[in-house]
């Protein structure tokens, strides 16, 4: 398994996982645009030529925001999400990342556990933020100012 910055060719595999995992899947074009845009914070895990996980976000130093973290269902519970997130954060630190935000569905317990294990702290709630199904968004932050090591 290899981790890398996403390349345009990864957009097809990322879009396929989006469709499989998310009810509000991003389009192939949206994914490719973010991969190719300056400030795009996009990373992919590849196993046997297959996209098995990705992190998509944006970096406008010193802040970054993660929009998506996804792992193929048949590859979960193996630490891939944690390791890819770690790779993304460490790589982005070299571009001036100091604070990293994300939002997660309140009912997405596995994702919340991953983010907490990686050092994110809950800093707020956005009531009824998500639709289909309706859910609150938990806003999380990981920052140097919280004495966390990137």
Language-model features: locations:
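Non-catalytic, surface-exposed connector residues within folded enzymatic/regulatory domains
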Residues: 25, 78-79, 134
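Acetyl-CoA-dependent GNAT
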Residues: 2-74, 85-91, 95, 143-149
């Amino acid at each position: 398994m290899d981790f890398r910055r996403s390349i345009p060719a990864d957009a097809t595999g990322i879009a396929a996982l989006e469709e499989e995992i998310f009810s509000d899947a991003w389009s192939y074009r949206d994914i490719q645009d973010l991969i190719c845009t300056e400030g795009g914070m996009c990373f992919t895990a590849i196993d046997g030529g297959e996209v098995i996980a990705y992190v998509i976000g944006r970096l406008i130093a010193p802040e970054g925001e993660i929009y998506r973290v996804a792992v193929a269902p048949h590859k979960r519970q193996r630490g891939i999400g944690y390791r890819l997130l770690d790779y993304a954060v460490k790589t982005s630190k070299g571009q001036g990342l100091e604070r990293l935000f994300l939002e997660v569905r309140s009912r997405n317990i596995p994702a919340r556990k991953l983010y907490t294990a990686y050092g994110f702290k809950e800093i707020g709630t956005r009531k009824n933020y998500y639709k289909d199904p309706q859910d609150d968004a938990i806003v999380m932050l990981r920052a140097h100012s919280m004495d966390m090591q990137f």
